[in-house]
Amino acid sequence: MPDFKLSAENRRRTKALTCSMKQTYLVIDACQFSANYNYCLLDALAKKGERIVYATTKFAHGHIPDPPDVTVFRCFFFLARLAGVVTSSGPVRRFLRAIEYPLNLFILLAYVLIKRIKVVHFIWIVSPWLDYWLIRLLQLAGCRVIYTAHNPFPHEPKAGDIRKYCRIYQKVNHIIALTQYTRNEIMAHCGISAEKISVLPHGDYEALFSRYGVNNKLAKEVRQKAGNRKIIAFLGHIRPYKGLEVFVDAFRLIKQRIPDSFFLITGSVLVGDKKDWEEKFAESCKLEDLWTDLRFVPVEDIKAYLSVIDVLIQPYISASQSGNTVMAYATGVPVISTNVGGLTEMIEEGKTGYVIAPGDPEAIADAVSKCFKNDNYKKMSQNARRAATEQFNWKKIAEQTAAVYRQVIS
């Protein structure tokens, strides 16, 4: 009977041949808009053996390491990065970015042609008009194009944005939506079929956060000021759609229900005036009941805050999904969120948090109170950790993403 066993040398050659035949997938986020998400997705894809090239720029807010076993191609905004060394002027850097972005796209297209890449995955769009034409050129070159829709449309849309994004949705070969809500919105506004959109959730940030330490000094300072009080927090960029003012209006109501409560608000003010927010905070509660940190918060400090807070409030007026929800779950923090967009898909009512109506300070206070009734908090904390590891698991998300890659080229 013939012996079909391969020798060690033949096995090595077979493995090398298989690797040489493996597709290279190009993933693009020109501005690193979702740097934490990108790192975790690419890390998970690389761990399952996928060959990934990440086209991006240097992260603008500190250092984020490159995902292991991922080729990073920094082909975007070299001049703007260089200008950042000599000037802090936002208008100057924005002007340079506008000038060089078309050149960056030309370099990217040349790279795709030289490397014979067949699948291109956009995680974010910078210019709906320019990126639409890049997508068309990529497809003419034989590429299949995938786009991840974190939101169906921009949070603060400009005139014509919906039409521009619909053109992109109609043109790409496949769409990855992070929630069912986003999928439904794209289908309703753009006439896209359900088969063209896969729903893959937003995973937790543990793969990235595990590479950083905790700012224990900061955590100690917060805990010293808060004492043994329950810390109710808002984390993340401050923009109109996030409804922070509703949470601030709930301070007094929460104190009435939970006298030993303490409030923490941290994140950069992207829209509005920092001083106006500080004045509103001062009017809404006593200084000794509040900790604020209005800046871009590095990972070490985020981990410090997550280590001390008890409940995360997301009083959003509109939203499609939230990475902060999963980030909180991973550390056992329940989440109170409004029933807008896809947020309700991320919360198990009464188990990992509570869903409330938007614009309702009373509802926030009632939900916070329910978190601490009897032994409810302990159970919710355990459920939150379970959701992070099961429902929002990156290994599973990476497998589903790779399946989409294979599907578009089959």
Regions found by a protein language model. Name each.
Residues 27-28, 90-100, 108-129, 314:
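Short N-terminal targeting/anchoring amphipathic segment
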Residues 158, 184-188, 195-198, 203-222, ...:
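Acidic anion/phosphate-binding donor-loop and adjacent secondary structure
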Residues 226-242, 248-251, 263-266:
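Conserved donor-binding/catalytic core segment of Leloir-type glycosyltransferases
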Residues 276-303:
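Nucleotide-activated donor-binding/catalytic signature segment of Leloir-type glycosyltransferases, i.e.
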Residues 304-320, 333:
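Acidic donor-binding loop of glycosyltransferase active sites
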Residues 328, 334-337, 347:
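Short hydrophobic beta-strand element within catalytic cores of glycosyltransferases
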Residues 349-350, 354-361, 370-375:
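Conserved acidic donor-binding segment of nucleotide-sugar-dependent glycosyltransferases
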Residues 376-391, 400-403:
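A short, well-ordered alpha-helix in the C-terminal region of glycosyltransferases
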